[in-house]
Amino acid sequence: MAKNNTPPNQSNSQTVHHLYSSAFLIAYLLIGFVPNLGAVDQIAPQWLYLNAVSVLAALYILKNHAYFSSAVGSLFKTKFSWLYAAFIVWASASYFYAINPTEVLVNLARVVGTSIAFVNVFVLLQKIPNKFKLIAMVATGALLVEMYMVLDPLLGLLKQGANASRSSLLKGTTGNINIAALSLVIKMPFALYLMNLAQKTWQRMAYGVLITLTIFCLVLIASRASYVALVLSLILYVAFCLYNYFKAGKPKRLLIPILYFVVPFVVAVGISELSTIGKNNTTFFERSATIVQATTDGSIAGRLRFYMVGVEHILNNPVVGAGLGNWKLMSILYDKEFINGYVVPYHMHNDFIQIGTELGIPGFLMYLGLFGLLIAYIVYIAKSKLPENTKFFVAFLAMSLSTYMVDGALNFPIARPIMQMVWLLVMALIVLLFLDAKAFNKDHKPTPLKNAYWVSVVCLVLLAPLTYITYQTNESLKGQQVLLGEYNAGKFTYPLNKIDQVVPGIPNISVTTLPIASMKARYYMENGQDDKALEMLRAGITANPYLGFSETLMSQIFTKKNQRDSATYYAKDAYEHLPIPPHFANYLNLLIQEGDTAEIDRIFAKDSVKHDPMVWKNYMIASNALKPTGDTAAVAVANSAIALFPADKDFLVLKKIAVLGKETVDRAFAISQEGSALFQQQDFMNAAQKLSEAAALDPLEFSYFENTGAAYFSAGLYELSLPYFDKVIQELNPKSGKSEYIKGLALINLGRNEAACELFKAAKKYRYAAADQALQTHCN
């Protein structure tokens, strides 16, 4: 019997280290279960949690630096670590040229925090026995909980017969359904790994059920990025199984593991197809088909537009970009013609291109290089002399890495702590296995790093400001609940004497890029402190110079101060930065006061292509106020508006004013009111006289003709009523069916039943309620 030469005290110490290291890794992986805790966005407390765990882990590693010195030394012998460090330095340098340097700090707290967590995780993993199985079990446990949090509401929706596809109820523990879907896909390879390790049938069946239910949830969530990642994982897994099959001499038993993924996939898709029969739920194949519909799918078309302008920006700014985290501001310049309200494209929906727009081509190449090195490491591991059971694990890491890369190419996982945590874990494991492979190939010998404690010291020094920034950001996102909530509701109920303390100074823009200072300035404006508000609004312009929000508020203050030139200057500035309806309306009102029809026509010609009804209405109001009655161009615009927005009756009123003039329209309305009053008194002849007079003044208003005909009909003068109904039916038809119905009754009274029945049928076509009864009574 072999003797254990490890001293008891050393063995106990190692066990303690294993337990602590495992506990820290588990703590890291629990990041996805941190709730929003009152913040606008769940990511704020999650980033704070990540840095807090890193502080504790770094302190533990520092305290035991001698124990971990070889792990630290190994890490800094890799090209990956130095490339990662270079990327961090380059990103940090963007503070000095960024549009908004404060936003760089906010994002550095996340990017650098992730890199420090990577260092901690790598070091902690080195000494843990059975690390692959431990990580797989924890990740699978997280997968089980996340899947259940999606499955439970999903089954409830299906039971109710409701439309479950893309339902926001399926977001699970995350902020939205897309994050939930990719979080499930990236963790699923760990469950598949355990399924391959399982020795007992019931264990394999349990993992199979978990994977099946996970894929079922994914199908109903219907996130296209998750579909791509899922299918890519399936392809990689099958390829890996076939590689083992041919490498081992084609033993049939090695084909069985293919079923571990294929069967759950087929079963899950099949069940989802059956569950959607007779409902409006999108099927897997229907949703998959939209992935390539770039011209008909707005979401895909929008992404392609983002990618093109992103590449354009990189080519125009090859060395330095907008600054880390600043694409959300720069995007306004490129996408302003497509922005509605203040909803800007915060993310590129492609982390790789977005990094290029923010950090230039050097930053893009460094970030892309990280993935290139990881792929190269995977290939090296596969060709190494490592034991097959160790190389076996890297195949599943490759699946998770591919999921992250798909997510990074179609979404923005760099902003999601739940995805960053799995990514850094996969990175750490791949680098660790690469070093093990080099050691087996005798290309690397682990050696302790002298003064290894300095690595932890540097991490802790960096974590102090980083944690402070994430804390400030978390507090800000709590306060933004107040600012954004009251802004969206148009309220000012929060006390002015507390408004400056509602959010800290970091960040200086909201999650929607509205400048915090400008949002606070609204309260000072409401309380008449205009000079204080102007000071804050100028700070708001510095924070976000492209949104136009601050400039619009400044224009309103200068209008109140009767400083017309300044008001117009800032109104135009806001409109040119972001030509949205509120900016258009504010600028237009000032142009009306100045009588500047040429500028009014210019901005309308620019904005009319958006087909926003408020833009058309505001322009027509301005045109009617400044241009002569019957102006040919004004009438042409009115006709175009009615054709574009046939259901909006406001445009008919505006057209009448353009054609007839407001005074005539108002006079006709007043006379019609007199006629309606006489009709109510059953003085039908005098009512008809007044109503016909109104119709003569305003021949564009169908109701005047219709009511005149109704008055003559009620007076028993059926023949006299017919021309008025004909005017409505043939020229002004509102498609209500009322004129057709009353004219039909008039014709019945005149003995023309056949023609009357045709009119009743027309009225029924327009869903006029009394038409059915008339048809039954007179047309059978």
Q: What does each of the following model-derived ranges do?
A:
Residues 526, 560, 593-594, 628, ...:
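Register position in tetratricopeptide repeats
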Residues 176, 292, 297, 302-345, ...:
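TM-adjacent membrane-interface loops and short helices in multi-pass inner/ER membrane proteins
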Residues 2-37, 51-61, 85-95, 106-120, ...:
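Alpha-helical transmembrane segments of multi-pass inner-membrane proteins
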Residues 477, 515, 549, 582-583, ...:
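Start-of-helix register in tetratricopeptide repeats
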Residues 1-92, 99-106, 116-140, 193-208, ...:
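Transmembrane signal-anchor hairpin modules in multi-pass inner-membrane enzymes, especially those
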Residues 152-156, 220, 226, 241-297, ...:
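A membrane-periplasm/extracellular boundary helix in multi-pass inner-membrane enzymes
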